[in-house]
Amino acid sequence: MKKIVKEHNKKRIVLIISFCMSAVLFGGCTPARLIQQAINDQLEQAVVGETQQVSSTSTDRYAYQQLQTEEQQVYDQILDCVMQHKDCVAVSTKDENVLEKAYECVMADYGELFWFSGYQYNTYSNFDQIIGLEFMPSYIYTEQEREELQQQVDMVANTWLAEVPADATDYEKTKFVYETLIKQVDYDTESENNQNILSVFIGKKTVCQGYADATQYLLHQLGIPAIVVTGTAGGENHAWNLVNLDGEYYYIDTTWGNTHFLGEWQGTKKIDYGYLNARTQDLAQTHTSQMPFAMPACESVVDNYFYREGLYFEAADMAVIGQKVTQEYLQGEKEICLRMSNLQDYLQVKEHLIDKEEVFQYCNGAREITYFENQSLCILTILL
């Protein structure tokens, strides 16, 4: 999970202005607070620099939309600074919390910003009063290096995305990205650049931050609104995604979809579809968002993998479930995922298919099967 690298430098400005000069500038009847404000405004422009209003390119981005007007201005200034590879920028706030919130929202909306790793900021003050803040990105690549690396990223991303049909639905696009990243990229805590997308597209090894950033980046290329969500999962720092499909919100956790990550399966890497277009209640027991804004309720099942594929069952009806297993088997599927609505039914289905080996009745001709479980989501995966 990506950390915000902040170094806070305070620069105190000691100002000596004679009473006579103040009288000339402001007149003897001007309230002292107005005089002080005028002085601070002049200092801000002289020392910090005049803040520049930046045209927004992010009005369609989810995290941006959660901000107030002042926060959006700071967001725009941060993004412009990073995209233009500037050394620093004076921001339109004197509140350090606004600066941090705007930064976190930029990182949520733009998973592709691999060329910097955080920021420093200067606080300028006139005695105890803050008169300005200056944002300074911490770049890890030069502008030329960034351009060369971006070309490598684009080459791989374009190759992958070329396989997506032009008429693909939102669901099909998310399924493709989810499967492609899990198949193409290994989970490796020792991987280089694992806090950005370079580890995915160039190194092919990453951790949760790389998976989440790459998922957001690829989905955006396909026209799917998505953000990177940071928080905790299973008691550890983690990153995953929030997506909008056909007007409904869902969660995607590509990292947890990799069976090697959770240790569900130690053989050939498989895909756990429980984290593809999941609901809030699916992740509530394990995932906790730490985003600086409230997350939407993800309640729809329309584009959930199991509903879409007809693999979700409300009851342990073995005639219905067995028929579905046979259908999948005859279609040549090597991996059959079944999801039950509750744990009791899940255990009953597992008893029939696995413990009593009834799976062989539905997969006539199969000589051996293996399986792995995700009991928290009531998912049984059969490998043929």
Ranges and model annotations:
Residues 144, 192-201, 206, 210-217:
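Conserved active-site-adjacent core of cysteine acyl-enzyme catalytic domains
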Residues 17-27:
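Bacterial N-terminal signal peptides
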Residues 183-188, 206-208, 232-236, 256-260, ...:
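Solvent-exposed loop/turn segments at secondary-structure junctions
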Residues 12-14:
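N-terminal export and membrane-targeting signals
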Residues 145-200:
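Secondary-structure boundary elements
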Residues 210-279:
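Hydrophobic/aromatic-rich core segments of domains that either
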